[in-house]
């Protein structure tokens, strides 16, 4: 399961993400954060952390460096 999620996230980074303008307010980017979180915490907890990270990636939050 973990490898399937990681393949999807890497596919997103390589093929889908370049179609949108770069707008992530954090370093590392949200998709890189998701990959790191899934590798560190497993699929369920990693995706939950990534979900809340994406919710924070908006003009109301300052952004900055945020590692999982």
UniProtKB/Swiss-Prot annotation:
Protein topology in the membrane: Peripheral membrane protein
Subcellular location: Cell inner membrane
Primary localization: membrane
Domain of life of the native organism: Bacteria
Coiled-coil region: none
Alphabetic keyword roster: Cell inner membrane, Cell membrane, Membrane
Pfam families: YidD (PF01809)
SMART domains in the record: Haemolytic
GO cellular component terms attached to this protein's record: plasma membrane
Alphabetical list of NCBIfam families matching this protein: membrane protein insertion efficiency factor YidD
Protein family according to the UniProt entry: Belongs to the UPF0161 family.
Role played: Could be involved in insertion of integral membrane proteins into the membrane.
PANTHER family: MEMBRANE PROTEIN INSERTION EFFICIENCY FACTOR-RELATED
Protein name stated in the entry: Putative membrane protein insertion efficiency factor
Source organism per UniProt: Aquifex aeolicus (strain VF5)
